Design a protein with these regions (language model features):
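Elongated, amphipathic alpha-helical interaction scaffolds
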Residues: 1-180
Length: 180
């Protein structure tokens, strides 16, 4: 039994963007991978402009494959990687950290400087990888967040409305391990 069309891969950018353009599909995927209580997801524009010009560029910007905003304000970046790249993990960290900074800068521009840290929303990431990146891990899905190195206790931040959760969390879905 063939599980998917031989010439169409869900990791191709155009296919992935089509699949994740449906909010209910994106919400279900995030719910299953990150194990979050997701009521719905709004798909938002994925470009990340940077206010600082670099030598060869007038305005530097990056684009993530899919960016969703959840009902509680949490943002989730979904990045699809077909080829194994040596610095993918570095780039993925950059996307998440950059989104946190961009969100705080928006609050600052709105004049919310005294409450901008209270108003911050978590940013989570899911990387869908065609080829394994985490060779020492056996499972197809692996999740990471900040923890105490001795106790293993999660480092959670406080947010508006009394939320107490991780500020950053990442998950990797390695497709070549999925059917093993």
């Amino acid at each position: 039994m063939q599980k998917r069309h031989a010439h169409v891969s869900p990791t191709l950018d155009i296919m992935a963007k089509k699949i994740f353009s449906l909010p209910e599909v994106t919400a279900a995927f995030i719910r299953d991978i990150l194990e979050l209580d997701v009521a719905d997801a709004q798909i938002v524009e994925g470009s990340q402009p940077h206010g600082m010009a670099y030598e060869e560029d007038d305005l530097f910007s990056t684009a993530v494959d899919v960016r969703a905003k959840l009902h509680d304000g949490t943002e989730v970046i979904i990045e699809i990687q077909i080829r194994k790249q040596q610095y993918f993990l570095n780039r993925f960290h950059y996307y998440l950290a950059n989104q946190l900074v961009e969100n705080v800068q928006k609050l600052r521009q709105q004049g919310q400087t005294h409450k901008m840290y209270e108003q911050m929303e978590p940013v989570y990431g899911i990387a869908i990888l065609e080829k394994s990146l985490l060779l020492d891990e056996e499972g197809a899905i692996n999740k990471y967040w900040l923890t105490n190195s001795r106790s293993g206790k999660q480092l959670k931040a406080y947010f508006k409305n009394g939320k107490h959760q991780n500020l950053l969390q990442v998950a990797f879905l390695e497709l070549d391990k999925y059917n093993k």
